[in-house]
């Protein structure tokens, strides 16, 4: 059986939008490029044709990948994540780190949605593993990294 892919509803919608774009815009454009390159004549030495075939293979692979992700998606209802008062996948968490004593905010998401530059942290990361299931005003140590540190959870949304 295939492994489930954990996604927020927003992440699922982004994948569906990407798939629609690939199917309705990108794939037809690549097919058009293939036809144009094919019309140039001799295919044995046609660099445009080779490039279009490579692009087609890339697009078809991405379409298949996105379809697989959508089909294996387990959507986390992040509207219910704060009802228990515990950190869960989909929670937005504010915390203070012992490294710099500054208030920071992250959202815990599935691994494929993770984007640390946007403060979207994978549920498989050391920080998420340490705080999932914890409540406000709990201090935890972030381990499994080269320099462990502590954080105190200030709010959960």
UniProtKB/Swiss-Prot annotation:
- Which keywords appear in this protein's UniProt record, sorted alphabetically? Coiled coil, DNA-binding, Transcription, Transcription regulation
Q: Name one GO biological process term.
A: DNA-templated transcription elongation
User: What top-level branch of life does the organism fall under?
Assistant: Bacteria
Q: Name one GO molecular function term.
A: DNA binding
Report the PROSITE patterns cross-referenced here.
Answer: GREAB_1
User: Signal sequence: where?
Assistant: none
What positions belong to coiled-coil segments? 1-75
The record ties this protein, via PANTHER family, to: TRANSCRIPTION ELONGATION FACTOR GREA (PTHR30437:SF4)
What's this protein's function?
Necessary for efficient RNA polymerase transcription elongation past template-encoded arresting sites. The arresting sites in DNA have the property of trapping a certain fraction of elongating RNA polymerases that pass through, resulting in locked ternary complexes. Cleavage of the nascent transcript by cleavage factors such as GreA or GreB allows the resumption of elongation from the new 3'terminus. GreA releases sequences of 2 to 3 nucleotides.
Q: Which family does it belong to?
A: Belongs to the GreA/GreB family.
Q: What is this protein called?
A: Transcription elongation factor GreA
Q: Which organism is it from?
A: Mycoplasma mycoides subsp. mycoides SC (strain CCUG 32753 / NCTC 10114 / PG1)
